[in-house]
Swiss-Prot record:
GO cellular component, one term: cytosolic large ribosomal subunit
Keyword rRNA-binding: yes
Gene Ontology biological-process entries: cytoplasmic translation
Pfam families per record: Ribosomal_L6
Known partners and oligomeric status: Part of the 50S ribosomal subunit.
Family designation: Belongs to the universal ribosomal protein uL6 family.
Functional description taken from the UniProt entry: This protein binds to the 23S rRNA, and is important in its secondary structure. It is located near the subunit interface in the base of the L7/L12 stalk, and near the tRNA binding site of the peptidyltransferase center.
UniProt name for this protein: Large ribosomal subunit protein uL6
Positions in coiled-coil regions: none
GO MF term (any one): structural constituent of ribosome
Recorded superkingdom: Bacteria
Length: 179
């Protein structure tokens, strides 16, 4: 019984260069490059225009690593070819974002502004005063940067003010009952 995810081949799109040297895997594409160390017990090989991963044995930890390695490598191939992005929406009177150099300056109703500088490999774009786009090749880092920005002023449940993902739905609460 092999890992259902791990046994699926990873298609290599045109324009992506893949190298496997021992346990080191690297992918290079139009959006950038990334590398990953394949866990022990898992071997990766390029067959035609696909990457195939095989597990050394059928033990539970090896099966788990098999699926994990395949998911990470497939994400890397997609990331260097297409890239990943998350869009954040700023809701609230006076709340806005302004591009400042490489980073973004947020006005979120505090007595001070908050400046966010992106880590290496991540780009931050302000499409308008109320929308910020986080882009990069690494899915995990894009999600983490977006989560850190959202955490600056998480949406509150009464009026929905704050920073939210563009596809996020805020569950609203009823306010105080009037007389």
């Amino acid at each position: 019984m092999a890992s259902h995810i791990g046994k699926l081949p990873i298609a290599i799109p045109a324009g992506v260069e893949v190298k496997i040297e021992g346990q080191n895997f690297s992918a290079k594409g139009a959006k950038g490059s990334d590398s990953y160390v394949v866990p022990e017990g898992i071997t990766a090989a390029v067959e035609g225009n696909e990457i195939v991963l095989t597990a050394a044995d059928d033990l539970r930890p090896t099966r788990a690593k098999h699926g994990l390695a395949r998911s990470i490598m497939a994400g890397m191939v997609k990331g260097v070819h297409d890239g990943y992005s998350k869009t954040l929406e700023i809701v609230g009177t006076g709340y806005r974002a302004v591009a400042k150099g490489q980073g973004i300056e947020f006005f979120l109703g505090y007595s001070h502004t908050i400046t966010v500088n992106p880590p290496e490999g991540i780009t931050l774009k302000v499409t308008d005063a109320n929308h910020v786009v986080v882009e990069g090749t690494d899915k995990q880092v894009v999600g983490q940067v977006a989560a850190n920005i959202r955490k600056l002023r998480a949406p509150e449940p009464y009026k929905g003010k704050g920073i939210k993902y563009s596809d996020e739905r805020i569950l609203r609460k009823a306010g105080k009952a009037g007389k």
